[in-house]
């Protein structure tokens, strides 16, 4: 992985060793807590700065969401051997690209003597320094493209959260009269749903609207802590179940290339935290500690990804569902696991929603009178939540939406853009040919995954629309 720029004790860039370039140590030690389109940044108040453990919790929750529980199906789509190996490779590339993004942002803050630059501004300022006159002239479009991708990705995450919570809530409610105290492996029995999944989405909607109106970082940290407690508790019970019963044997080591494309979309979707890296660093009380948080947190995350994906597929085999919680036994213990994880996802919604809200809301509010600012702020936030709910209602297929969002926008933000930014940022500072070749290869890999994965996900959706599923739910005894 590339070297992260060394930081002074005050959090400023001291030295940049990536690609043979050097950065000035000039810059302000304060950072903005907002990831907005505006180029003017307010200094971060010490009272709002977050500690090491708080940032670690935010990072953990940003990457352990609904896509995490879809990894057993992803491994099924790739194969028992290819799946875990590919997860490790994609994870390493993603963390490396996060490191590149941090490196470019830190270098630009020193060069421009800015306190903080977000992902969008990093893209714009990188293009302003690249050798192409056309790109320098149109550098502002780089900011617009990244802003659009961030909005699509994060709102896509939020739509998936709606589907996940609705699917699990439906199963909990409609299986209540089948639920027992004895936890036995499920035996599939298809029953007609009492209520459509969309009804449960609409039930959740008003509570999420109230949740996103909370904007204080300290309060969001409390929500994230609650989400982490419930999520880790439920994950402990899930892992306990996965290892206690004999697994399926003779599972394919390598799956079809068509289903592997769905694996790519799901895998890259699962690394949900790329949009949160720069905002989290800006909110940290001691920014020089952020590289340690990043590597420690992401190493733990990748380890969990591989374990859950492999064990889940080995456990349920061909019956693996879009979310592993839907495979759990129909007993009160594991029904509580679904409820706990859904509560964790509920609070994580606010964390993922923060990124698009901080891009869109200030832009809209700045065009209104000051008397209407608060009303418009709250209205836009509520409208965005309704938009994610509406998207989930239109395409209530958890696995395909995860793969589509991952292929379309997550791959661009996580794999395609950061390597290109490194070339643009350091090209005039004697970046090595090896680094350029490496960056081009990563971007091409991300582009291939984006195009082919998007095609396969859309193809599966069209097949699904031609042969729609019955309005039924899997009830297991």
Curated annotation (Swiss-Prot):
Entry keywords, A to Z: Membrane, Transmembrane, Transmembrane helix
Compartments, record wording: Membrane
Entries under Pfam families matching the protein: Aa_trans
Keyword Cell membrane assigned: no
All ranges on the Cytoplasmic side of the membrane: 1-54, 99-144, 224-225, 281-291, 366-374, 421-439
Transmembrane keyword on record: yes
Membrane topology: Multi-pass membrane protein
Transmembrane regions listed in the UniProt entry: 55-75, 78-98, 145-165, 203-223, 226-246, 260-280, 292-312, 345-365, 375-395, 400-420, 440-460
An annotated GO cellular component: vacuolar membrane
Primary localization class, coarse: membrane
InterPro entries: AA_transpt_TM
Ranges annotated as biased composition (Basic and acidic residues): 1-13
Family: Belongs to the amino acid/polyamine transporter 2 family.
Protein name stated in the entry: Proton-coupled amino acid transporter 3
Organism: Rattus norvegicus
Lineage of producing organism: Eukaryota, Metazoa, Chordata, Craniata, Vertebrata
